[in-house]
């Protein structure tokens, strides 16, 4: 009887081990499938962004510097709110980086605008939509603030990247085209960071 019980126990343990190994294989396969899907999704998203950018008309020099200045001003204002009100250390660190980076791009655009022919003066006045977005952000607290800020950062950086790429490829002023070409990869890096944070802050 004891031998039979022992055999049953061994068989049970073996079956459990097999089930555990099978579950691990299934989990590994599921993770691999998720990674493939995510990579495919990224490629589709990038292709869609490129198609949209191709359809947008390239702004003239004055419109370009105005749009760039407003984008930077909005980013800095939102980042200052986030540096004071965000609950996530990662979000606060991102906000501080945005203040520095967009202050630098503001200076770069101003310098290029002065070299443009004819010279143009950037107008950083926020649009009504940007002001509304900042007002809504001020109303958020805690984790909801982090989510609102990062969601807005994804949208803002998508727009900024499209603007910089558009002028870098089709702009009419050489100095501004060069500045846009230098700023575009920086904005692209910010967008990737914002999307990574979005996956952590979205509820």
Locations of regions flagged by a protein language model:
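C-terminal motif of bacterial Sec signal peptides marking the signal peptidase cleavage site
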Residues: 14-17
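His/Met- and acidic-residue-enriched segments that coordinate or traffic transition-metal cofactors
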Residues: 2, 19-203
């Amino acid at each position: 009887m004891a031998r039979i019980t022992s055999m049953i126990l061994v068989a049970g343990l073996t079956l459990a081990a097999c089930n555990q190994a099978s579950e691990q294989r299934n989990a590994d396969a599921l993770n691999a499938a998720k990674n493939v899907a995510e990579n495919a999704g990224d490629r589709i998203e990038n292709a869609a962004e490129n198609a949209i950018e191709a359809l947008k008309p390239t702004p003239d020099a004055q419109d370009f510097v105005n749009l760039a200045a407003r984008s930077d001003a909005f980013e800095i204002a939102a980042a200052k709110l986030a540096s004071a009100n965000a609950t996530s250390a990662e979000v606060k660190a991102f906000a501080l980086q945005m203040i520095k980076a967009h202050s630098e791009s503001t200076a770069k655009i101003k310098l290029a605008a002065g070299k443009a022919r004819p010279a143009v003066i950037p107008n950083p006045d926020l649009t009504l939509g940007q002001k509304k977005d900042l007002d809504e952000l001020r109303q958020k607290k805690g984790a909801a603030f982090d989510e609102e800020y990062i969601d807005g950062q994804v949208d803002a950086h998508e727009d900024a990247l499209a603007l910089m790429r558009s002028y870098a490829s089709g702009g009419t002023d050489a100095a501004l085209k060069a500045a846009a070409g230098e700023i575009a990869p920086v904005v692209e890096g910010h967008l990737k960071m914002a999307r990574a944070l979005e996956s952590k802050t979205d509820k």
